[in-house]
Amino acid sequence: MKDRLPELKQRTKETELSKDKDVPTTEAEEQGVFLQQAVIYEREPVAERHLHEIQKLQESINNLTDNVQKFGQQQKSLVASMRRFSLLKKESSIAKEIKIQAEHINRGLDDLVKEVKKSEDESGPSSVVTRILKFQHAAMFRHFQQTMFTYNDTIAAKQEKCRTFIFRQLEVAGKELPEEEVNDMLHQGKWEVFNESLLTEISITKAQLSEIEQRHKELVNLENQIKDLRDLFIQISLLVEEQGESVNSIEMIVNGTKEYVNTTKEKFGLAVKYKKRNPCKILCCWCCPCCG
């Protein structure tokens, strides 16, 4: 059998020489990769700053959600008592706090959108920082949107309860008024229908009248709250339309990542097969005495 060990040594030397010749190119390529990684590491403080702001914004949304839940718990039952001034005052303070928090969160989400666009211009839409900001904005905006919808439903339910209470009081007093007429009084505040002549005409007491007027004040207060939040809901609806494209983009990126991972697995499998078929290993086998 022919001894091919000298041939193996010769090929090994040629391989080493070819590696020495390719060193500048390889180092340049590696330097390019390391430079890119270095840029990411240098930008880590920027990412941490964004994450710190995101955490503060998320805490604000959680506090808003808690206040909305407290407001909703208070509206589950209407207290048919004349001593409701303190309760109304407390509800009004919570509503004002919710409004301030919602406006603050809305400004924070707007600033985050600006940061996303800035990151896209500087690093591209597929950079790590950009994708993190997009995902965090989408998640927090969805949470904020659900909270505000819950608050709106709570206010609408309370309006309906107050309206039902007023109709019931009028029925008990024996005064039947058309629903449209009562609604006009509620919207316009024309309570001259409940004057002294009405008190003498029907058997309604001043206590009942005061309770009805109290409910009317609640309705007026609720309508003012809805008017204050109208602009905010319009901005939310516009952001929903913008978020649709962002969510679709994120979904496409995730699907692309899955395809890339599958392709990488296939390439690793081929690499294992090519490694098993390495010609150097075949030459080594021919040199072994056991194969003689």
Swiss-Prot record:
Chain residue ranges for the region called Disordered: 1-28
GO biological process: exocytosis; intracellular protein transport; synaptic vesicle fusion to presynaptic active zone membrane; vesicle docking
Subcellular location: Cell membrane; Cytoplasm
Superkingdom of the source species: Eukaryota
Signal peptide: none
Coiled-coil segments on the chain, per record: 46-122
Name under which the protein is recorded: Syntaxin-19
Name of the coding gene: STX19
